[in-house]
A protein has these predicted regions:
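Catalytic cores of the polymerase beta-like nucleotidyltransferase superfamily
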Residues: 1-189
Length: 189
């Protein structure tokens, strides 16, 4: 869609001028085939971008493991915070830039708050474990949107809904009901 691409180019590409962010994407892309894009923006930064809101946090989903991420970015002297290493999450900090990178994963078992996970390289599988359609929209470094659950449409029409069965989503993590209510109020759904 040309209109969406023009919006992305206008709003996000100036954001890509950050040399450290470009470095991270370049390093994560190394050794991958042209068919495979190993890192994409996801969650709040994509949702806020599509809603023309200020982006205050940057989440990146990746098919790479945390060890591989740390190895690839070591030359740039990021502060690496192992914020959720057992769940595949590292936070990279440099100057005012803070990036949270999480390995693609799927839930194996949940207890209402914490999940036992398994890493995957499947973007659709990763998207299915997210809470809301508007938080499961991916955006690659080239501005292409990957939207497996019609989250962009829901965002445009101010619809806040769970991915799949709401009861299942809430049983997996009880905090999701609070997030749902927060977004329903925010987007006046």
């Amino acid at each position: 869609n040309i209109e969406i691409f023009q919006k992305i180019k206008k709003k996000i590409f100036p954001f890509y001028k950050n040399k450290d962010l470009k470095f991270v994407f370049k390093k994560l892309q190394e050794d991958s085939s042209n068919q495979s894009i190993p890192a994409k923006f996801v969650g709040g930064c994509v949702r806020k971008y599509l809603s023309n809101e200020d982006i205050d946090d940057i989440d990146i989903a990746t098919s790479l493991t945390t060890d591989k991420i740390k190895e690839k970015i070591k030359e740039k002297k990021f502060k690496v915070i192992e914020s959720g290493i057992k769940h595949g999450t590292v936070t990279l900090v440099k100057n005012k830039l803070k990036l949270e990178l999480t390995t693609l994963r799927r839930d194996i078992k949940t207890d209402g708050r914490h999940a036992e996970i398994e890493f995957t390289d499947n973007w659709l599988e990763d998207s299915k474990r997210r809470d809301l359609t508007i938080n499961a929209i991916y955006l690659d470094i080239n501005g292409k949107i990957y939207d497996y659950h019609d989250g962009a449409r829901d965002l445009k029409t101010n619809v806040v809904k769970f991915i799949g069965d709401p009861n299942t989503r809430i049983q997996e993590d009880y905090l999701r009901i609070i997030r749902f209510l927060r977004f329903a109020i925010q987007y006046d759904s």
